[in-house]
Design a protein with these regions (language model features):
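Cation-handling catalytic/transport regions enriched in His/Asp/Glu
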Residues: 1-249
Length: 249
């Protein structure tokens, strides 16, 4: 499709989320796991990024943004999936219609902090390894496993915790995330800090939602990501909300 179009009239974006979820079994309908529900919210966040764009050029609209900014709209949307107030709107027993009990909501929230210290260290190790590999200037006769061990030893990584992906099967570093694997954790910093604004003013607060829409979702890649974020939040992103939500603070 051409990136050029006639200048008269509005062109409405068309976005479709296609998901592969748990199939129905016999007379039992498709019942989504909590992970699948979060995936649905996540992908709809990407959809909103495309639907609400006000950019004039396709190449900088919607999700056509920096790699370390693209997951903010999707990951912040995941937060609503497990907010108790939202859960009670849709989490119903498929036979009785009974609303999910508070005891089960508590378990869903508690599992979010399980093993997060281990997981965060894995991700950080892989991100640093990715950066180190892309800082190499001479790769002749490089023993990648020996290099990985040396890099991890310098970090003080204990043998029980390895990088999330070992060098020999680290597909991200040659599949679009070269020197960019850190963006997964950075996006988590952004989405947790951004959602903190909603928690401060109410998770359905229209003013906060409009700020996010006007300064992030509509803007695409038309301005520097940090400028857009600060226009929304009023400050640079803080690390504390991510650490708190991972049970590490």
């Amino acid at each position: 499709m051409s990136n050029y179009r006639e200048q008269q009239g509005a062109i409405r974006p068309l976005v479709c989320n296609v998901c592969s979820f748990t199939q129905p079994v016999g007379d039992i309908p498709s019942l989504l796991t909590i992970d699948e529900v979060e995936t649905l919210f996540h992908e709809f966040g990407h959809a909103l990024h495309g639907l609400l764009t006000k950019c004039n050029y396709k190449g900088i609209s919607g999700t056509n943004v920096a790699r370390d900014f693209v997951e903010l709209p999707s990951q912040i949307n995941e937060h609503w999936a497990t907010e108790p107030e939202v859960l009670k709107m849709y989490a119903k027993h498929y036979q009785t219609g009974e609303t999910i009990p508070d005891s089960l909501i508590e378990k869903i929230l508690n599992q979010k902090t399980f093993n997060q210290g281990f997981m965060t260290t894995e991700l950080l190790a892989a991100a640093i390894l990715d950066m180190n590999l892309h800082n190499l200037t001479n790769t002749q006769n490089l023993d990648v496993l020996a290099y990985e061990k040396e890099a991890m030893d310098k970090l003080g990584l204990i043998p029980e915790i390895a990088p999330r992906y070992r060098t020999t099967y680290f597909n991200h570093i040659i599949g679009g995330y070269a020197a960019g694997y850190y963006s997964y954790l950075w996006a988590n910093v952004l989405d947790n800090d951004a959602f903190e604004a909603f928690k401060e003013h109410g998770i359905f607060d229209k003013k906060t939602a409009d700020l996010f829409r006007n300064n992030v979702l509509e803007k695409g890649n038309s301005e520097d990501p940090m400028t857009l974020y600060k226009n929304f939040r009023g400050t640079e992103p803080q690390l504390e909300p991510m650490l708190k939500n991972r049970g590490m603070k």
